[in-house]
Each structure stands twice: as C-alpha cells, then as structure tokens.
C-alpha cells in the first residue's frame, strides 16, 4: 500500500523558516519524480515544484523558486520542502504527491502551515 505522510507544519512568524517532510512507503521511492502542492484557504491547488529520482533536476513554479527548496533522501524514502522568508500568503495546506504521467497518482495526508505573528 502506497503511503505518503507529511510532517513539520505548524505556526511560524512572518519571515521565518520551516522544513516540511514527506515519508514515503509501499513503493520504490527512488524510482519516481515527486512533487509538493499547496492549497491556501479558499483557493485552488497550487503546484510548488517537483524533483526527479536522483535529484539532478528540480523544477519550481517561478515565483516560489527563490524561497522554497525541494530535496529528497532516497536512503530514507523522504521528500523535503525547505521554506524561508514565509509570509501570510504562504498559509496553506501542504501536500506531497507522487508524479505519474502528466499528473499525480498518490497524495499525502497533508500538513498545515500557518504564518502569523
């Protein structure tokens, strides 16, 4: 059974940093592209970026690439999202997802980031 379990969310002050994790199990993690996606309150899903199996290619949505860093540890079957200089508009539900074809076939259970002073 494929499972993706996010962690690391919480309350962060504006300008702060946070690292989210996504622990994968039930499949060969090292063989798949993986993505991060978020959903702000009252908004639709927003793709953050993706990373290929050996971390040699990482793609970001343009306006987030300077503040978010995606990485992975295949030995630990874990995907990461390092966020810096967070602002109130970064408040959202954050999901990891396994890429498949032109979309995603499995999603994580979600972790929540709230940016507030």
Curated annotation (Swiss-Prot):
Which Pfam family is an annotated match for this chain, by its short name? V-set
Question: What GO biological process terms does the UniProt entry carry, in alphabetical order?
Answer: immunoglobulin mediated immune response
Q: Which PROSITE patterns match?
A: IG_LIKE
> What are the record keywords, sorted?
Adaptive immunity, Immunity, Immunoglobulin
**What further note is attached to this protein's record?**
This chain was isolated from an Ig gamma-2a myeloma protein binding 2,6-levan.
Q: What is this protein called?
A: Ig heavy chain V region UPC10
- Gene Ontology cellular component terms for the protein in this record: extracellular region; immunoglobulin complex
Q: Does the keyword Repeat apply?
A: no
A molecular function (GO) term: antigen binding
Task: Please state every residue range assigned to the domain named Ig-like.
Answer: 1-116
Superkingdom classification of source: Eukaryota
Q: Which InterPro entries match?
A: Ig-like_dom, Ig-like_dom_sf, Ig-like_fold, Ig_sub, Ig_V-set, IgHV
- Give yes or no: UniProt keyword Cell membrane: no
């Amino acid at each position: 059974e494929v499972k993706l379990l996010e962690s690391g969310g919480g309350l962060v002050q504006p300008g702060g940093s946070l690292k989210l994790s996504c622990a994968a199990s039930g499949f060969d993690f090292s063989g798949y592209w993986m993505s991060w996606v978020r959903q702000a309150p009252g908004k639709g899903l927003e793709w953050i970026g993706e990373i290929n199996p050996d971390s040699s290619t990482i793609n970001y949505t343009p306006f987030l690439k300077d503040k978010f860093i995606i990485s992975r540890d295949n030995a630990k079957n874990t995907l990461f999202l390092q966020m810096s200089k967070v602002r109130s508009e970064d408040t959202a539900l954050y999901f990891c997802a396994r890429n498949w074809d032109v979309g995603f076939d499995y999603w994580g259970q979600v972790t929540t980031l709230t940016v507030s002073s």
